[in-house]
Amino acid sequence: METGNLPDNTLILDSLIHSVLVINQEFIICYANHAALQVLAQSRRKLFETPFTDLFSYHSFDAELMQETLANGQSFTDNEVILVIHNQSHTMSLSAQPISEQHILLELAPMDSQRRLSQEQIQQAQQIAARELVRGLAHEIKNPLGGLRGAAQLLAKSLPDPALTEYTQVIIEQADRLRTLVDRLLGPQHPGKKTHQSIHHVVERVAQLISLECPENVTLLKDYDPSLPELSHYPDQIEQVLLNITRNALQAVEKTGGTIILRTRTAFQITLHGERHRLVARIDVIDTGSGIPPHLQDTLFYPMVSGREDGNGLGLSIARNLVDQHAGKIEFTSWPGNTEFSIYLPIK
């Protein structure tokens, strides 16, 4: 059967929308199609003979496992990798397979938007379920705590030896400490007064509070968009959200020194809770700390999840809950030297 004059292989590869690269056994790039040049923001001349892993300031895939798998003649696939290119984070799928004894074919494809949305919905449902479970447990703990404290007070009054009240006082103090923890688990019960004003009032107040806590080796920068429209929000709640996140950022940089950035921007065509918004407000909290460990990133907003030994894991869970009450969302990206939390709030 006649096949006609087929186009050159490179023309076929350049017509693909996904990034395709050919590397050798040492991971040195031998070829990159047009889509790869665009994603990597490099020319073919610069890419040629460059190690593949050197293209990224950070990558989440296991390069050693990938090299070992390919050396055994097997294909390697990671459906969700984070690649940081020119300080921009990209979530992609990575597949690699040997095409000869000397060469390996790599394909990079951006995560499908529908798949990303589905994952976000699953994670949100899991977080809501975990939050409701914790709230239920908190209520069950709170009820007997009141009885325990009251009994300790009555016992203190009836003790014949005043010296023994030292022990009942310990019971009362520990009951109060547990009640405070339970109240934090339940989150704020009174949202305060809702206002329609610039979000910069809240952001600036948080900046002032955090600046008082910053040691000399930490720089706090502010980058506000003056054209950001006013929006309806509960200032006390948004202040709590920003304080929780910014204090985490401060703890990430205060020992070694670094920078925290508070930034506001207008974002366009963003989906919040299943509704497409033409215009939303975005508040970013960025720090130059060591980053969030990969094993914590999928469950970071769950109650009681913390990357610090002395952390209680409630700050981000409460922040997520408060942003949800505003019909908004929180996203983050993190790698060593850069962690960015973005809060999206609808402008109506």
Swiss-Prot record:
UniProt key word Cell membrane: no
Record's keyword terms, sorted: ATP-binding, Cytoplasm, Hydrolase, Kinase, Nitrogen fixation, Nucleotide-binding, Phosphoprotein, Transferase, Two-component regulatory system
GO molecular function: ATP binding; hydrolase activity; phosphorelay sensor kinase activity
Residues that bind ATP: K329
Coiled coil (residue ranges): none
Chain positions with Phosphohistidine modification: H139
Catalytic activity reported: ATP + protein L-histidine = ADP + protein N-phospho-L-histidine
Protein name (database record): Sensory histidine kinase/phosphatase NtrB
The species this protein was found in: Proteus hauseri
Species classification: Bacteria, Pseudomonadati, Pseudomonadota, Gammaproteobacteria, Enterobacterales
